[in-house]
A protein has these predicted regions:
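Non-catalytic, mostly N-terminal accessory regions of nucleic-acid modification and defense proteins
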Residues: 1-200, 262-271, 369-372, 396-403, ...
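A conserved structural/catalytic subdomain of Rossmann-like adenosyl-cofactor enzymes
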Residues: 2-4, 275-497
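Soluble or luminal CAZymes and related metallo-dependent hydrolases
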Residues: 8, 12, 239, 318
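Short small-residue beta-strand/loop micro-motif enriched in glycine and branched aliphatics
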Residues: 172-175, 229, 409-410
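Non-catalytic alpha-helical coupling and interface elements of nucleotide-dependent molecular machines
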Residues: 38-44, 150, 168-172, 223, ...
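Conserved S-adenosyl-L-methionine
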Residues: 178-286, 291-299, 306-308, 321, ...
């Protein structure tokens, strides 16, 4: 087969997904397409590497060496073996998935478990439900995938990674309301990586990693800057089982081998610990779920990992619980983070005491207000909060505010950051100086004088001098935040009577 182009790869992957249209809801595409893509890829790479061993030393030599391959496929569990089946195809796929998962356990490295395919194909029940996935539908998708050889020679890891990320984005477009659970706008993620500037040999962590896009973009930063990236250790935790599997497949298909992705509730059961403390990392990126109400506040109030040093957040908003988890996960010397949050964390009265303590810690480095519509199913503007445990001397006692709400483009109903937007914002963070109507360095004393408010508009007047402009998305978001706070207060009062 001829080498596949990146555009052909994207096109054929999406056409395979569209075989499911009308059969299942669009939000469920990822449950089937990602495992099949991963299965096809590892089967073709296995064949490619096995053929190299045969050419090197013959069939017997290849059989011995196949046990040392990065991913092992047991006899009878290859893509071609499943392709030959015409009845109960879903059940046969499940058997192959389980056999491959069991044949590839995680390995131990530096006292932790790395890689491994246990559970990577995600939930299995849907495959054997013939009402949802009849044999002819599964066979059609398998035949569609079989048109191309997805070996490393035909499709290098970086191109496969691009195609996978493309598919994640397409599924987000199609999934609508559920997209934000697993996908963060990649141009925003690229900005966060540019601000934090990952380095070789560092440990990078995302406590709510979704499909792994923030981790991938951090490695892309190193690749794009010509720096060594394979020495980077990658860690993530994701509460959704299918989504954590998608993240692991994403990392594998991007050529990443040194990673640990855990499935579980980060607030209740943090996966990465060191004795009685959380493990710490050089760099943390996160887009925590916004203002969730269903979380174990009572356990956090007596958190055994010491993550409530600012206080215990209200039941109706877990934002500062995630914030404190992230701060506790930062290395004291090299630790830095970039977090996507709703603007409310900057000014809500119910979190005032926690915000005051945060300001006094002097780890806040930059607060960036970004444009509206950059998130699926959310028209609101958000902010990026950058913290550093060990701020440079000239930044101590000061915080940089950036008003980047106008640094956004929109095309085909999709909002995104252009390269020039990313460059402008990232350079402003690095220079840490005033820019008229865009950036302002503010002392902690001045923040105290402003009642410890951290909202960007408190410190930067970006309005037109000749017009009284009302920013409707910002005003609407502020109204929503106030309404939610009022509702929470009413609920609290009602419990007293």
């Amino acid at each position: 087969m001829a080498r596949i182009t990146i555009e052909d790869l994207k096109s054929f992957l999406w056409s395979a997904a569209e075989d499911l249209r009308g059969q299942i809801d669009a939000a469920g595409y990822k449950e089937y397409i990602f495992p099949l893509l991963f299965f096809k890829r590892i089967s073709d790479v296995y064949d490619e590497q096995y053929a190299e061993y045969v050419a090197e030393g013959g069939e017997e030599y290849a059989k011995m060496q196949s046990e040392e391959l990065a991913i092992r496929i047991p006899d009878g569990q290859h893509w071609q073996d499943v392709r030959e089946v015409t009845e109960n195809v879903g059940q046969r796929l499940v058997e192959a998935f389980i056999a491959i998962e069991q044949a590839n356990p995680p390995r131990e490295a530096d006292g932790r478990l790395v890689g491994g395919l246990d559970g990577i194909f995600g939930p299995k029940d849907g495959w054997t439900n013939k009402n949802k996935m009849p044999d002819h539908i599964i066979t059609s998708i398998i035949e569609n995938f079989s048109k191309y050889n997805l070996s490393l020679a035909n499709c290098p890891a970086d191109e496969m990674g691009q195609a996978y990320e493309y598919l994640v984005g397409k599924f987000a477009d199609d999934a609508g309301n559920t997209a934000q659970e697993f996908y963060t706008n990649r141009t925003v993620v690229e900005l966060m990586a540019e601000i934090l500037q990952p380095q070789p040999n560092e440990a990078i962590y995302d406590p709510t990693c979704g499909s792994g896009g923030m981790l991938i973009k951090s490695l892309d930063y190193l690749r794009n800057h010509g720096k060594e990236w394979k020495s980077v250790q990658v860690f993530g935790q994701e509460i959704n089982g299918l989504t954590s599997s998608i993240a692991r497949m994403n990392l594998y298909l991007n050529g990443v081998e040194d990673f640990s992705i855990a499935c579980g509730d980060t607030l209740r059961f943090p996966a990465f610990v060191d004795g009685s403390r959380l493990r710490t990392f050089d760099m943390v990126l996160a887009n925590p779920p916004y203002s969730i109400k269903e979380w174990d506040r009572s356990s956090f109030e007596h958190d055994k990992w010491g993550r409530n040093f600012l206080g215990t957040p209200p039941q109706g908003r877990a934002d500062y619980a995630f914030f404190q988890h992230i701060i506790a996960s930062m290395n004291d010397k090299t630790g830095r983070c970039a977090i996507l949050f709703p603007h409310g964390v900057l000014f809500r009265d119910e979190e005032k005491i926690m915000r005051e303590k945060l300001i006094e810690m002097d780890i806040l480095d930059c607060i960036i207000g970004i444009g509206a519509n950059l998130f699926y199913n959310a028209s609101m503007e958000a902010c990026i909060i950058v913290c550093r445990k060990n701020k440079p001397e000239h930044r101590k006692g000061r915080v940089l505010f950036i008003d980047a709400k106008n640094e956004v483009s929109r095309k085909d109903n999709v909002s995104f950051l252009e390269p020039e937007h990313i460059d402008k914002i990232a350079k402003a963070c690095e220079r840490f100086e005033d820019v008229d109507k865009f950036a302002k360095v503010v002392s902690i004393e001045d923040i105290r004088a402003n009642r410890n408010l951290l909202s960007v508009q408190t410190y930067i007047d970006s309005s037109d001098d000749d017009a009284d402009i009302v920013d409707i998305p910002t005003a609407l978001h502020g109204w929503n935040e106030s309404a939610q706070a009022l509702s929470a207060n009413v609920d609290s009062l009602s419990k007293l009577f």
